[in-house]
Amino acid sequence: WASLAPDAGAILMDIQAATISYFRGWYVYASGLFMVIALLLAVVPKTARIRLGAESDRPEFSRFAWFSMMFGAGIGVGMLTYSTAEPLAHFANNPDVILGATTALERDNLAAAYKWTLLHYGLTPWGCYAIVGMSLAYFAYRRNMPLTIRSPFTAVLSAESGRRIGGVVDAAAILATIIGIGVTIGYGVNQLAFGMHQITGWEWLVSEGRPSLTALFVAVVFLTLAAMLSALSGIGRGIRWLSNLNMALSWLLLLIFVIFGATAFAGEMFVAGLLEYLSQIGQMSVTVWSSTDTPTARALSDWQSAWNIFYWAWWIAFTPFVGLFLARVSRGRTIGEYVIGAILAPSLMCFAWFCIIGGTALDL
């Protein structure tokens, strides 16, 4: 329906987003922090030694391939699109600017811009993915249950209740995945069309300053075929090969920026932004601004709805898809190793990416 009536669909989805933000924004926001805390509690020595599988099971993939596949499943076009755009956007406006604690487009706002950027791509989104993947892997490989979203729920319910709720849970997971993938593809095809236009200069790719329908259609077909070929080749072949290539190209791009970019400035932002983020992650993760009659309150609420709550809903919508994949490739890993590989390592990778590439853009 949205594809046939995009304007009406956009209006309805804007209304739904505003409704969720107003009535359930606090729940969406608090869920992310809860997942991070639950994962950090799982790395206590006794729990960290538990293997996701039988004690004799060993990992199917090397650490590099395992991390590459998890990182590629959890993030992609968003990091490419927003590695420069988001730090620049927050440098111009963020809650600290709205509250008057820092000044827009001034040096005192740099650390604040990065702490909000790192909040959106740090422990919280990876925690959402990781806790779903860990619970699925635990019940699938240690309790011999099917590797489905319903398994953790049916394990704690009676057989009758489990059968009843299982179908609903799986259906909700499928719907959430479709919505999450739809958002990602929307960003991806726009970026692909604009990028090809910048490289080739082909006019048919852009119409009235936006990607043309023909360009979007071609981009969707291309991405769909690439995804199909990757999936049909299997995890051990095509997906692993593409993930390794993706990781190698990511490191190559980072190396280019380290050599030719604003390395000293990026390093300064990495340290300052990371310290600011770690010292305030608790406060940033529980503060929910409500829209009242004051202009400041409305500005804070609008900013949080457009950024934080939108991101959290996006990450949570993707958790069934990404969580299943993380569980599939993590058999034989210990919980401690899993937490490091699924939340800490990718968070640091995102921090480095945004600080090195985004820092170069800010320095310019």
Task: Name these PLM-found stretches.
Residues 161, 165-168, 172-340, 345-364:
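Membrane-embedded translocation segments of transport machinery
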Residues 20-25, 54-73, 104-106, 113-122, ...:
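Transmembrane-helix boundary/entry motifs in multi-pass membrane transporters
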